[in-house]
Amino acid sequence: MTFQKSTVVPAAEGRVKIDKDDNGNYSVNVKVNNLAKPSRLQPERKLYVVWMETENNGIKNLGRLKSSSGFFSDDLEGSLSTISPFKAKRVFITAENESNLQYPGSIVVLSTSDFN
């Protein structure tokens, strides 16, 4: 599934792939291109966090979006691969100052539509 067009970072585009494994867990793979450095946003932020809205368990922090260099460099690409026991309703990315948050901030950079 692709992310919808962003009003915060219009050039950004990306995909989310979710597969259910033999143990009933979900493999979540996120890839994003043309994402601005979070320090260039208004207000300025330090990093991007990937979130998953689940069907029955609220919103879960999946982790920090990482680039190949560890920080957002000139390639402006990011990715995240993780496992979740929860079924996704949608996935979205926020700009934050910390990665270990329980709830997303208000700056939603990219979001999928609801999964069927």
Placement of each model-derived feature along the sequence:
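N-terminal targeting/export leaders
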Residues: M1-N116
